[in-house]
Design a protein with these regions (language model features):
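A recurrent flexible, glycine/aromatic-enriched loop bordering the glycosyltransferase active site
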Residues: 48, 62-99
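Active-site-adjacent helix/loop segment of glycosyltransferases
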Residues: 50, 56, 120, 124-188
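Glycine-rich, basic loop-to-helix element that forms the pyrophosphate-binding segment
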Residues: 1-8
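Conserved donor NDP-sugar-binding/catalytic core segment of glycosyltransferases
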Residues: 19-61
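Short beta-strand segments
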Residues: 15-17, 40-46, 95, 135-137, ...
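A short, conserved alpha-helix in the catalytic core of glycosyltransferases
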Residues: 24-30, 85-105, 110-140
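Short beta-strand-to-loop acidic/aromatic patch adjacent to the donor-nucleotide binding site
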Residues: 9-20
Length: 188
């Protein structure tokens, strides 16, 4: 990812291979970055995206009532977006501001390597530099989840990278728990 970020000449969209996107997803994902200079990242709603999960917040979900992606997204598309600030973007499908990338730097390969936590660390560094990470509340993408790593390796990486994240950003869990308690998009 860092190799691509170094070559970027414009804003960037990171998308996992286990994600399906609807029509006009890129426009909606990137619009907040074009509209407001101090937005570092944008993340849509999805089935499995922790603080961006729908219908059950912070859970892995199946597609709502078995509906196809496009039908669910058609409902989200009608929402007047608020773009609430979040403590982190979520890397399954995340827009990144090129100016923020250049100011904050690249993903921390030394502490996170491949896997999990690198986007959370980057987003925390972006906040420290005066940026915001926002939820794109008028976009829904399907994240099949779990296809990136075998289960045993996933658990090991999650533990190691979570520990590294908390060493670098001791308030991360508190900030994320506060966001979850507030659940600013509950009405959706």
């Amino acid at each position: 990812v860092n190799r691509a970020l170094k070559m970027a000449e414009n804003h960037v969209a990171l998308v996992n291979t286990d994600v399906e996107v609807p029509e006009e997803w890129l426009e909606r994902l990137m619009l907040p970055i074009f509209a407001k200079e101090k937005i570092a990242t944008t993340t849509p709603f999805t089935t499995c995206g922790t603080i961006c999960s729908f219908p059950d917040f912070c859970r892995d979900n199946k597609l709502f009532e078995g509906m196809p992606l496009w039908e669910i997204d058609d409902e989200f598309r009608m929402i007047r977006p608020q773009y609430p600030a979040m403590p982190t973007g979520v890397g399954f499908c995340m827009g990144m501001n090129l100016k923020a990338i250049r100011e904050v730097g690249l993903l921390d390969e030394e502490n996170f390597g491949k896997g999990y936590g690198e986007e959370n660390d980057w987003c925390q560094r972006a906040i420290a530099a005066g940026y915001e990470n926002v939820h794109v509340d008028n976009l829904f993408v399907y994240h099949k989840h779990g296809g990136s790593f075998p289960s045993e390796e996933k658990q090991r990486l999650l533990k190691e990278h979570s520990d590294a994240l908390l060493r670098k950003h001791p308030d991360y869990n508190k900030d994320t728990a506060d966001y979850c308690r507030r659940d600013p998009l509950r009405p959706v």
